[in-house]
Swiss-Prot record:
One of its GO terms (cellular component) is cytosol. It comes from Homo sapiens. The active site is at E56. Residues 160-182 form a coiled coil. DNA deaminase (cytidine deaminase) which acts as an inhibitor of retrovirus replication and retrotransposon mobility via deaminase-dependent and -independent mechanisms. The A3H-var/haplotype 2 exhibits antiviral activity against vif-deficient HIV-1. After the penetration of retroviral nucleocapsids into target cells of infection and the initiation of reverse transcription, it can induce the conversion of cytosine to uracil in the minus-sense single-strand viral DNA, leading to G-to-A hypermutations in the subsequent plus-strand viral DNA. Homodimer. Interacts with AGO1, AGO2 and AGO3. Its cofactor is Zn(2+). It catalyses: a 2'-deoxycytidine in single-stranded DNA + H2O + H(+) = a 2'-deoxyuridine in single-stranded DNA + NH4(+). Changing I173 to A/E: Increased DNA deaminase activity. This is DNA dC->dU-editing enzyme APOBEC-3H. Its main location: cytoplasm. Zn(2+) binds at H54, C85, C88. It is found in: Cytoplasm; Nucleus; Cytoplasm, P-body.
Amino acid sequence: MALLTAETFRLQFNNKRRLRRPYYPRKALLCYQLTPQNGSTPTRGYFENKKKCHAEICFINEIKSMGLDETQCYQVTCYLTWSPCSSCAWELVDFIKAHDHLNLGIFASRLYYHWCKPQQKGLRLLCGSQVPVEVMGFPEFADCWENFVDHEKPLSFNPYKMLEELDKNSRAIKRRLERIKIPGVRAQGRYMDILCDAEV
């Protein structure tokens, strides 16, 4: 399995509200772990957005291509740098409805356009369709770091300090997500009534 470089993880899972110079693009990455209920070895991999295919759609296509045994249950855990956009939320819900032998859990480092109504609706749709969406905390960042990152090369930073900082930053994002899950709740001091049609 291909692994992320430590620097890619450090940059792309960075959940600070504002970036410092030099600026860099925050890409959409999805790391997944598929664990059979029978205790077999988990399958892992990752995807990033392509020009005409979001990482979530690449993930769905990959799982479909595996020809999984539908008489067996599987736990699927996904770690994303950005929460799914509204379009991908619908695709994920349809996918899980058609594959009820899969239990999917989504953990995101950051919330994608969280102030926009379509994205809020997408997150609520997922949570209401037995696809829990949560913000990554220390356990999820640590698990992602351990299982999806190449640790062979020397590091230019302290990984434990990085994980602690990610966990600290995630607390405000978790509160934001909890407000989104409840329609009509005030967010950032104002009603979340901004219309936004932006998509990547």
